[in-house]
Amino acid sequence: MSISLGNAFIKNFLGKAPDWYKIAIISFLIINPLVFFFVDPFAAGWLLVVEFIFTLAMALKCYPLQPGGLLAIQAIAIGMTSAEQVKHELVANIEVLLLLVFMVAGIYFMKQLLLFIFTKILIGIKSKTALSVAFCFTAAFLSAFLDALTVIAVVISVAVGFYAIYHRVASGQGGTPSHDHTCDSNVTDELSRDDLENYRAFLRSLLMHAGVGTALGGVMTMVGEPQNLIIADQANWMFGEFIIRMLPVTAPVFICGLLTCVVVEKLGICGYGAKLPENVRNILEEYESEERKNRTNIDNAKLIIQSVIAVWLIVALAMHLAAVGLIGLSVIILATAFTGVIEEHAMGKAFEEALPFTALLAVFFAIVAVIIDQELFKPIIDAVLAVEDKSSQLALFYVANGILSMVSDNVFVGTVYINEVKTALLDGVITRDQFDLLAVAINTGTNLPSVATPNGQAAFLFLLTSALAPLIQLSYGRMVWMALPYTIVLALVGLFGISFLLEPMTTMFYDFGWITHGTIEAATNAVSSGH
């Protein structure tokens, strides 16, 4: 049936997004200029922020780049901010953009090593509880040095591989290379179907443990999450100092996070507790044994090279030898040069995962520019900063960041809050020591409670929108339900750390000489976003 040209334009607008979503975005684009010019620019600014958060919350209906980008372009066009201010934000946060472009691509060329590690873990550990802790801990360790998105990408590729191996055998097509593991129609044996359902539940729980692990590790270092880099840059902290300043909160949270992993597996609550079926284990062990036999010296040489590059990566990051993105670029060069990847099309695949998110981050910064120009957060920040009790001030910042990060993206929230606190410091409203404590509250507030929903953590959203999610029946609701015990524990232990441990332990670190008191001059010299 032919379609009219007018209907074709409507159908093409935001593609397969539901009609109600398209109408909502068009309504936003009509309402915003009217409110800005005829009601109040401040109200229009807040309306834009709410609309942008809506596009993030509806990320499964439509990737937020397109609707969020349209809102951002209109905001610049009608004068809510300027293209120059957006450029200023991008330049100020160039390290984050470099991280996303080069580091994620760099790790792509080390996938063989990471796949090898996770394969050994999955096959080698018989206890489900121990395996869950191992996945959570390994994901946390890797996320402390690498990007959480990359770690989740690796875990997903491992899980898809293992799922496909068993599905092929269960479908009676063990030797078929072109087997479609997304179709269950050939899995007719009831025993195989039961095993498949249990295996799906097993993989779901492992992926959620790994996902939370990326949050546990990601909060600890300045390279763990994109907003950490922004906060470290504004505070003028180096790699080591960032870790030490976060320890009063991150250490108890990490321990309690791993304990939560054990408890949910032992009790079998919130969708956890599924064990690896024996039939599946036998099939996977046979596969791993076959792979080991077929591994050539070429493959071994690649694994050795990638191991050496991994050591270089950790040392370079720990010693802050260059901007994180540039270290990522060095990984791309070393990994491709020494493993023989020299064709342009082979290299291009490495950049596919990160670039859409990098573009979305640029749109975030356009919204941040509006928030700065319209001074949207000023009343809230002023109210929190006006609280005389410093401990209450820290707790309020943590809670405010946490709640916003559950519904919005934590990069966006962290950027906005650190900008406002930096302004307060430069205006003499707070001391440099209080600024440092607030920076810790902002960093932990954006990283820990945000595990509640896929909207908050980019790694969770990446998992939810991956090809694996429908295979193992991981829906939005199921993800929120499985994250619930972690959300409660991480948020409350984080709040306890902010309220009772942060100030005394930071004072102790000063006394030990592990960190030194910062100066306002140092913060002024750091690249200042939005000023």
Swiss-Prot record:
One of its GO terms (molecular function) is sodium:proton antiporter activity. It is a multi-pass membrane protein. GO terms for cellular component: plasma membrane. It is found in: Cell inner membrane. Disulfide bonds: none annotated. The chain crosses the membrane at residues 13-33, 34-54, 90-110, 121-141, 145-165, 206-226, 242-262, 308-328, 352-372, 394-414, 456-476, 482-502. It catalyses: 2 Na(+)(in) + 3 H(+)(out) = 2 Na(+)(out) + 3 H(+)(in). Keywords: Antiport, Cell inner membrane, Cell membrane, Ion transport, Membrane, Sodium, Sodium transport, Transmembrane, Transmembrane helix, Transport. The keyword Repeat does not apply. Na(+)/H(+) antiporter that extrudes sodium in exchange for external protons. Belongs to the NhaB Na(+)/H(+) (TC 2.A.34) antiporter family. This is Na(+)/H(+) antiporter NhaB. It comes from Aliivibrio salmonicida (strain LFI1238).
